[in-house]
From Swiss-Prot:
Polymerization of globular actin (G-actin) leads to a structural filament (F-actin) in the form of a two-stranded helix. Each actin can bind to 4 others. The modification Tele-methylhistidine is found at residue 73. Belongs to the actin family. The keyword Ion transport does not apply. The lineage of its organism: Eukaryota, Metazoa, Chordata, Craniata, Vertebrata. It comes from Pelophylax lessonae (Pool frog). This is Actin, cytoplasmic 2.
Amino acid sequence: MDEEIAALVIDNGSGMCKAGFAGDDAPRAVFPSIVGRPRHQGVMVGMGQKDSYVGDEAQSKRGILTLKYPIEHGIVTNWDDMEKIWHHTFYNELRVAPEEHPVLLTEAPLNPKANREKMTQIMFETFNTPAMYVAIQAVLSLYASGRTTGIVMDSGDGVTHTVPIYEGYALPHAILRLDLAGRDLTDYLMKILTERGYSFTTTAEREIVRDIKEKLCYVALDFEQEMATAASSSSLEKSYELPDGQVITIGNERFRCPEALFQPSFLGMESCGIHETTFNSIMKCDVDIRKDLYANTVLSGGTTMYPGIADRMQKEITALAPSTMKIKIIAPPERKYSVWIGGSILASLSTFQQMWISKQEYDESGPSIVHRKCF
């Protein structure tokens, strides 16, 4: 596809927005899904102060802004801010005219029907796109791994899902959702660092803690044993320099933080961990396809990027599954972007071209067309 009419692929995550052109092997633009508004009145005349900032600019000015995430738990909750993010994506990041390109958007599994309709409406009525499509995130991740059957454990910043897929179709009755993801782990790390005597409270400081989490945390293969090691020696301690030059030391917090994925009780939640949720999802499927799911368990999303997570999943699921079952956890190195990559693959397939919802179809049927064409 030539750049002129290439389809645009936008993966709107709770934490990061990934955007680019179909056919590319990686997104061109990756920026935080944040809209920031000034906390104080502007006093410098002629500074060209704006009433809102999006993405990296909001991130860099976070000290004077109140930051809001319009996507919570994978689902859009603030449409005005969401529109700002899309506007920023088209005009500032990709520098394209949306009325000239088909747009592929992604959505969380079990997204409310009204949400997909609203997305469709905004694309056609606000941005005048010639065509659009809404695809389920986990399905795209599976495409990116070169499979059509498997179970995807997709965990991002706002929500975690386990989605069994057979021959390209998601099995909705077996999809499970866990409202425990990266943002909760960041908040938990803030809490346990506060117990150490470091104070992180504002939205701006939360971003510092997110960086600590991404750079230093890992998943222990055996949590109790790791705790014992941490208690008896300083071999697991690492230091981190804060923006103001202060250096903090972090020890067992490094693996206590992501351990909450396997033991949600750490966060005071009564739900099952990601290993049990994956197992339960497989058990909701037909007995004949379970073998294929166990052997094709694909991890996707930024919250699966912790070192050690695949080995731990392998160990935990092996303990739950029948003893003779072959279990394979696939953790592609590019899994942070695998939803976007799958979208790029899908939107550039020749067989996909008849799947787009065209402006004409939208004008004839209205927003509900999305339920008939996107499944």
